[in-house]
Design a protein with these regions (language model features):
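Short alpha-helical transmembrane segments in multi-pass integral membrane proteins
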Residues: 1-37, 95-160, 204-258, 314-381, ...
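Short runs within selected transmembrane alpha-helices of multi-pass transporters and secretion channels
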Residues: 88, 157-175, 183-191, 212-225, ...
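Hydrophobic transmembrane alpha-helices of multi-pass small-molecule transporters
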Residues: 79-82, 194-198, 223-228, 298-301, ...
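Transmembrane alpha-helix boundary and packing residues in multipass membrane permease domains
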Residues: 40, 44, 56, 93, ...
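Helix-terminus/linker motif at the lipid-water interface of multi-pass membrane proteins
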Residues: 45, 49-67, 137-144, 200-207, ...
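N-terminal transmembrane alpha-helices
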Residues: 25-61, 75-90, 94, 119-126, ...
Length: 463
C-alpha cells in the first residue's frame, strides 16, 4: 500500500484511526475487490513460480526421476501448507472484523495471540514431519527408485517449515487489514532469490534435489523475517492498548480456524490419496501428473486469491455494519472469476504442450507428455466451476459461517476421491482428474444453498 495516511480521533478515550486502508468498506465493490485482489493474484503467481522453480530446474538439469521425486512430495507438503492457510483464516476473519469496526485493541490482541499460538504449532509440525518423512512417503507408495531423494527433499523442507508457516499467517494478517501489496513485494523478492539459488545449487554446484530444497528453505526464511519486521512496523501505527495473549480471543479464533484447518488439510490429505493412486502407474506417469498439478495450482490460486479477497471484504463490511455491500461484492467476485476462467481456457488450449515441456524437458517420454496434456486440457474447460465455488466459500468464511463451508468441501473431496479410487485402477489414469469438475460444482451448489438462506445479510452478528 501507499504510506498510511491517517488521523487520530478520540472516541470515549479510545484512539481510532481513519485509514486509506478502509477502501474495502468505502469504494465501489468491483473496484475495491479488483484493487485488493490483483496483488493477491500476482502474489499467487509468484508463489507458484517459487514452488515451480524447484520442479523446472530439477527437471531440466537433473532429469525426470528427480522431477518425480520433488513432485511426489507435493501432495504431502500441501497438507502442512494448508494447515497454515486454514489457521490463518481463523485469525484473519477476526482481524478484518475488528479492523472494520475500528476496534484496534482487540485487533492487536488477536494478532498477538494467534502469532504465539501458531509459532508453537509450526515448530511441533516441523519436528513431526522431519521425523516421519520416510514412513509418510512409503505410505504413499512412492516408487522405490525415487524414494530416497523424495525423503531428503522433504526433510530439508520441514527444517524450514516454521518460516513458511509464519509467512503464510502474516500474509493473511496483511490482507485482513487491506494490505495486499506488501505480501506481493515479499513474494517477488523471495521468488527471484529462490530461482537464483536453485540455479546456483542445482545447476552450478550439482547438489540435485538437496540443493533445490535448501534454496527454498533459505528463501522462505528470509521472506518470513522481513514479513515479521514489516508487519510489526504496521501494527505500531494503530495506537491502542492490547493483551499479548487472551484465552477468550483464542477460543473465538479457533471456532473459525478449526473447521478451516479441517477443510484445508482434509482436502490435501485427499490429494495425497490421489497421489497414491497415481504412483503405481510408474515414474513417467507421475512426472506428467506432477507437471500438470503445478499448472493446476497456478490457475487454482487465481480463483483462491479472489475467494480470499472476498473474505476480508465481507468481514470488514460486516464489522462496519455495511451489510448491503456484501451481496454486491459477491457479484463482483463472480465477474472476476468469469474473466480469469476464460483466460485460463485460452492459455491452456493454445500452449499446453509448451507448458508441459517446461517441466518435462527433453527427458520426458510420450507417456509423461500425454498424461500432462490430457489432464491440463480437461481442467481448462471447467475452471469456472472452481471460480464460483471459491467466491461463495469466501463469503461464508468472511461471515464466519464455517460448517456449511466445511461440509461442501468434504462433498467435493468425496466425489474426487471416489472417482479416482474406484475407476482409475480399473479404467486408467484419466479417471484421476475426470471427477474433479463434478466435485467443484457440487461444492458450489451446497455453499450457495447455505448462503441463500442468509440473504439479505441480517442474520450474522457484526462482532
Amino acid at each position: 500500500m501507499n504510506a498510511l495516511q491517517c488521523k487520530i480521533i478520540s472516541d470515549g478515550g479510545e484512539n481510532k484511526i481513519m485509514s486509506k486502508d478502509e477502501y474495502l468498506i468505502t469504494d465501489a465493490p468491483l473496484k475495491a475487490l479488483t484493487v485488493f485482489a490483483m496483488p493477491m493474484i500476482l502474489g499467487s503467481f509468484f508463489q507458484q513460480v517459487y514452488n515451480m522453480a524447484d520442479s523446472i530446474i530439477v527437471g531440466q538439469f537433473v532429469g525426470s526421476s528427480a522431477l518425480a521425486a520433488v513432485g511426489a512430495c507435493a501432495a504431502l507438503t500441501n497438507v502442512f501448507i494448508c494447515v497454515a492457510l486454514g489457521a490463518g483464516v481463523g485469525a484473519g476473519v477476526l482481524v478484518s472484523r475488528y479492523f472494520g469496526a475500528r476496534d484496534y485493541s482487540k485487533m492487536k490482541t488477536i494478532v498477538s495471540t494467534s502469532l504465539i499460538t501458531f509459532l508453537i504449532l509450526s515448530i511441533l509440525l516441523g519436528l513431526f514431519g522431519f521425523c516421519f518423512s520416510h514412513p509418510m512417503m512409503s505410505l504413499l507408495q512412492t516408487p522405490a527408485d525415487i524414494l530416497d531423494e523424495a525423503v531428503l527433499y522433504l526433510r530439508v523442507y520441514f527444517v524450514g517449515f516454521p518460516f513458511l508457516f509464519m509467512y503464510n499467517i502474516l500474509s493473511t494478517m496483511f490482507t485482513s487489514i487491506g494490505e495486499s501489496k506488501i505480501p506481493l513485494g515479499l513474494l517477488i523478492f523471495s521468488s527471484v532469490l529462490n530461482i537464483f539459488m536453485d540455479l546456483w545449487m542445482v545447476a552450478g554446484l550439482g547438489l540435485g534435489v538437496f540443493g533445490a530444497a535448501l534454496a527454498t528453505l533459505i528463501a522462505q526464511g528470509i521472506s518470513a523475517v522481513f514479513s515479521i519486521l514489516i508487519f510489526f512496523s504496521r501494527m505500531r501505527r494503530y495506537k491502542s492498548h492490547f493483551s499479548w495473549f487472551d484465552g477468550q480471543e483464542l477460543r473465538s479464533m479457533l471456532r473459525i480456524a478449526v473447521p478451516s484447518v479441517l477443510q484445508q488439510s482434509t482436502v490435501s490429505i485427499g490429494m495425497m490419496i490421489v497421489q497414491a493412486v497415481v504412483n503405481p502407474f510408474g515414474t513417467q506417469a507421475l512426472a506428467g501428473y506432477s507437471a500438470t498439478m503445478r499448472v493446476e495450482n497456478v490457475f487454482s490460486l487465481i480463483f483462491i486469491s479472489i475467494g480470499n479477497a472476498v473474505s476480508p471484504y465481507v468481514s470488514q463490511n460486516l464489522g462496519a455494519k455495511k451489510n448491503e455491500r456484501i451481496k454486491k461484492g459477491y457479484h463482483a467476485a463472480l465477474v472476476l472469476d468469469l474473466c480469469f476462467a476464460v483466460l485460463a481456457f485460452i492459455v491452456i488450449e493454445t500452449l499446453h504442450t509448451q507448458i508441459s515441456s517446461l517441466f518435462l524437458g527433453k527427458d520426458g517420454t510420450a507417456l509423461a507428455y500425454q498424461v500432462s496434456g490430457d489432464y491440463m486440457r480437461w481442467l481448462g474447460y471447467f475452471f469456472i466451476f472452481m471460480g464460483i465455488k471459491m467466491a461463495t466459500d469466501g463469503v461464508l468464511r468472511g461471515l464466519g459461517i464455517m460448517w456449511p463451508f466445511l461440509i461442501a468441501n468434504m462433498v467435493n473431496l468425496a466425489i474426487r476421491l471416489s472417482v479416482a479410487l474406484i475407476c482409475a485402477p480399473r479404467f486408467g489414469i484419466a479417471f484421476v482428474w475426470l471427477g474433479v469438475p463434478a466435485g467443484w460444482l457440487a461444492n458450489f451448489l451446497i455453499s450457495y444453498a447455505a448462503l441463500r438462506k442468509l440473504w439479505p445479510i441480517d442474520k450474522v452478528d457484526s462482532i
